């Protein structure tokens, strides 16, 4: 058994064909991530078409997450330039050796600041600032291409939550079955709510909003951001450009804890298997990183460059599934302590999870929106639980959740939906007639939750 942790895989040039995607889905990918920072409508549409063909071939529908560019500063569209260590270079607003595309960048920067280009591959130190022109010394050189990220360590320019490209992306994806929107560089609860408002206005009623924690504001305001979001993503690559690397484990632990105590989904991202961009086997430290992430009870692990541009996208998924499966066996023998809820809905969810585990029985529920399933998943059940859902839209949402297996049965009153879920589980030989099952449904007619423990007789 692979275990309850879900795998998010980024679709890119290396994985954009239906045949590659089908292999990735069959090996355990639960959510396909499309990075809206790259490409455009034509490329995104092609990815979605390939994904639909792959789903049809495998017989499995997955979550679809659009990852927005957010308030990111980038270099211009100039030709690649080689920056040598020791060079004094000019950064200007759409001019100079390093053209920068945001005026706000120059309002933030000061003499002595460290500037990181292209995910930290190139490092500069600022020597002087004059309006929209900055002189900086190259500390670590390299070839700088167009549209690369520009970060000032420890600082974040005051940019709007959504770029013009983000708005175009959301308009395109509005009717494409997107289940999750990843909000990049989330800086506050207000930031998250502004994106949620736009998403709802475009008709994405069920799409969940996940905040990506990528900078100092996200870390310092993690409590309010987690409260405003449906989940958080720990983007370790971008965090590593703002903090010293030895701080990252503590920051990761802090974010996981703040999200867990608010019952939010946690996704860990970046560099899990980065060596596999070039090599077919992971390093020992990468294996340990994935193993420890599962023990830390991350709900999902994200592959980025490994599946988007790497040489071994299928093997990357295979290794992540293999390692997480091994870690799950350890987790099952020593489960983590669960938060003790104070609200009735969460007390009910925890009670159901613990009841099913004490009986070693399957847990089956029917959820019209996926919210009940989210509450169950927040307590990290050690066995797969089955969620009857009314539509493919909700199925894609639930697919992202720890341990959840969605079953599309149609839109019914809750008790009827639960019965339909059982019928489908029986037809697919997932639940057998002699098993004791814990079931739960909401009776709108009587205004009560119904919880049963019974031996099924099909």
From Swiss-Prot:
Binding locations of Mg(2+): 214, 238
Site (Transition state stabilizer): 212
Record field: pH dependence: Optimum pH is 6.1.
Keyword flag Hydrolase: no
InterPro entries (UniProt xref): Pyr_Knase, Pyrv/PenolPyrv_kinase-like_dom, Pyrv_kinase-like_dom_sf, Pyrv_Knase-like_insert_dom_sf, Pyrv_Knase_brl, Pyrv_Knase_C_sf, Pyrv_Knase_insert_dom_sf
Cofactor dependence: a divalent metal cation
Source organism superkingdom: Archaea
A Pfam family reported for this protein in Swiss-Prot or TrEMBL: PK
E.C. designation(s): 2.7.1.40
UniProtKB keywords: ATP-binding, Glycolysis, Kinase, Magnesium, Metal-binding, Nucleotide-binding, Potassium, Pyruvate, Transferase
Temperature dependence: Optimum temperature is higher than 95 degrees Celsius. Still active after 120 minutes at 100 degrees Celsius.
Pathway listed: Carbohydrate degradation; glycolysis; pyruvate from D-glyceraldehyde 3-phosphate: step 5/5
Keyword Metal-binding: yes
Binding site for ATP: 35-38, 74, 148
EC class name: transferase
Binding site for K(+): 35, 37, 67
Modes of activity regulation: Not activated by classical allosteric effectors.
Binding-site residues for substrate, renumbered to this chain: 33, 237-238, 270
Catalytic function, reaction form: pyruvate + ATP = phosphoenolpyruvate + ADP + H(+)
GO molecular function: ATP binding; kinase activity; magnesium ion binding; potassium ion binding; pyruvate kinase activity
Summary of subunit composition and partner proteins: Homotetramer.
Homology family: Belongs to the pyruvate kinase family.
PANTHER family in the record: PYRUVATE KINASE (PTHR11817)
Protein's name in the database: Pyruvate kinase
Organism (species): Aeropyrum pernix (strain ATCC 700893 / DSM 11879 / JCM 9820 / NBRC 100138 / K1)
Gene of this entry: pyk
